[in-house]
């Protein structure tokens, strides 16, 4: 446990030299950083798991971590072909094994030829293996209907988070009323608030419309921008599509409106598109900001600055631990792009295993390849099950009194709104907790279900939510949803 300020004098009294680095002397901006997805509730979940291993009796037999979008931690089986290619790259002696298909061997040989010393253990260039960047560019071109993508505008990264933080770092400048402001959606993914706190930038909240399935309204963007200009200099706008934690998928019309707004107000656009393969609602379709921007033509296509992000952690692969991703920049100033390259160089290079898996993600087996039937079957099975889980989650929550869940159109989460009795709110305040944090802690202690309170993502005053992944196996998901709904009913009776 960290020392509090008043404990330093006790050190001196004991004849110990005061530490150079203390809570008082450390970077104050780091102290302000919060990351709810791995916050106090998750720490308590770890403690409960340890207690269960030690034989301590609980009202449950396991902790179900529905707090984070980690598919394989929740039981998803890895897709075979990417792992075969990775195994061959890590241990090239396996290239002589009859246990691996020929197309996986060809892919591994091609990747190894592009690596320094023909080994995955060598550093790549800081922007990532050039051949893989070229494959990413071809993927983007296919995705966007033939719109060109330049590999020199693509930087591979240690997951999308690493790239997002890099771009934010480029944007942050100024002091006082000239500090950089960044518009982020509320509810938001806490990476953004954490990074802005660390960089001493200003978080400018714009609220998604819960009554319209978490729609993004340009009128709300204008309100947020107008108020922010009184105390900072807004320079960037972030959009998460499909949404995290809210699961909505933006329409093309909405994206066009956002691009016009950003252009008119001279805002750099950050498009967090890591869930682009996770679209479940039949009425929804993913549209990339790059494609829409280009098809809008001048002046937007040639002038609006954009950084778009993707990752191997989500989609159908769920390879979170290998940390692979990329950012594509559009219309970025050439001198700034050089500075971005410099920042990447300081970090040496993204992990090469993550780069390998990214290459397979953007260039999967073709229909003529021997691995295609199995790959396609596994991919479709994962996405079909996620779609079924999204529908089930919405259905069960909306049948429970006091819980309302918008359609989970995409991504990997539901973000239901829960009604909490006034006495529960009062009790939470007495304990110094946010009301939904109090609810989620009680839920964890009594059921073993670990979810993240909505206050960790931001929400309108007087509303309470939690984020829950839809990733648990179907045989566990329905009982989990029913148990959670039953707990809410019990909690409501207790505090009514």
UniProtKB/Swiss-Prot annotation:
Keywords: Acetylation, Aminotransferase, Cytoplasm, Phosphoprotein, Pyridoxal phosphate, Transferase
Cofactor section: pyridoxal 5'-phosphate
Residues with PTM N-acetylalanine: 2
Catalytic reaction annotation: L-alanine + 2-oxoglutarate = pyruvate + L-glutamate
Gene3D superfamilies from the UniProt entry: 1.10.287.1970, Aspartate Aminotransferase, domain 1, Type I PLP-dependent aspartate aminotransferase-like (Major domain)
Disulfide bonds: none
One Pfam match: Aminotran_1_2
GO molecular function: L-alanine:2-oxoglutarate aminotransferase activity; pyridoxal phosphate binding
Main localisation: cytoplasm
Residues modified to N6-(pyridoxal phosphate)lysine: 314
Family the entry assigns: Belongs to the class-I pyridoxal-phosphate-dependent aminotransferase family. Alanine aminotransferase subfamily.
Full protein name: Alanine aminotransferase 1
Organism annotation: Bos taurus
């Amino acid at each position: 446990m960290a020392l509090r300020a008043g404990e330093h004098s006790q050190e001196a009294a004991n004849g110990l030299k005061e530490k150079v680095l203390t809570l008082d002397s450390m970077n104050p901006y780091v102290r302000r950083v919060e990351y709810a997805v791995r916050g106090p509730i998750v720490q308590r979940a770890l403690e409960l798991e340890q207690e269960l291993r030690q034989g301590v009796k609980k009202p449950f037999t396991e902790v179900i971590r529905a707090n984070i979008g980690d598919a394989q931690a929740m039981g998803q089986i890895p897709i075979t072909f990417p792992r075969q290619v990775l195994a061959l790259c890590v241990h090239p002696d396996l290239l002589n094994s009859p246990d691996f298909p020929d197309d996986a061997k060809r892919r591994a040989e091609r990747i190894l030829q592009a690596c320094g010393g023909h080994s995955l253990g060598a550093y790549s260039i800081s922007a990532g293996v050039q051949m893989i960047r070229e494959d990413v560019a071809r993927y983007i071109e296919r995705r966007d209907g033939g719109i060109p993508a330049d590999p020199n505008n693509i930087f591979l990264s240690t997951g999308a988070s690493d790239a997002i933080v890099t771009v934010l770092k480029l944007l942050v400048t100024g002091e006082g009323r000239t500090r950089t402001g960044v518009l982020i959606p509320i509810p938001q993914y806490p990476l953004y608030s954490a990074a802005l706190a660390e960089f001493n930038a200003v978080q400018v909240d714009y609220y998604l419309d819960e009554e319209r399935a978490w729609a993004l309204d340009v009128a709300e963007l204008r309100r947020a921008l107008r108020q922010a200009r009184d105390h900072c200099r807004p320079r960037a706008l972030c959009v998460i599509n499909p949404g995290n934690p809210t699961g909505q998928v933006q329409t093309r019309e909405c994206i066009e409106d956002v691009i016009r707004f950003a252009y008119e107000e001279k805002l750099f656009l950050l498009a967090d598109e890591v869930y682009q393969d996770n679209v479940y609602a039949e009425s929804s379709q993913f549209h990339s900001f790059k494609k829409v921007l280009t098809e809008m033509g001048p002046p937007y296509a040639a002038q609006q600055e954009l950084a778009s992000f993707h990752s191997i952690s989500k989609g159908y692969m769920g390879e979170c631990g290998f940390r692979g991703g990329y950012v594509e920049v559009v219309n970025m100033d050439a001198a700034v792009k050089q500075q971005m390259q410099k920042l990447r160089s300081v970090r040496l290079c993204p992990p090469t295993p993550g780069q390998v898996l990214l290459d397979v993600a953007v260039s999967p087996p073709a229909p003529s390849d021997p691995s295609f039937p199995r790959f396609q079957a596994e991919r479709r099975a994962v996405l079909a099950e996620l779609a079924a889980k999204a529908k089930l989650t919405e259905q069960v929550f909306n049948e429970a009194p006091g819980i309302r869940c918008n359609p989970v159109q995409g991504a990997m989460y539901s973000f239901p709104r829960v009604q909490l009795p006034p006495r529960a709110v009062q009790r939470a305040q007495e304990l110094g907790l946010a009301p939904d944090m109090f609810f989620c802690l009680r839920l964890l202690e009594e059921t073993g279900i670990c979810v993240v309170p909505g206050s960790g993502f931001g929400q309108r005053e007087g509303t309470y939510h939690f984020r829950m992944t839809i990733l648990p196996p179907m045989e566990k998901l329905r009982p989990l949803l029913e148990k959670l709904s039953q707990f809410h009913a019990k909690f409501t009776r207790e505090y009514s």
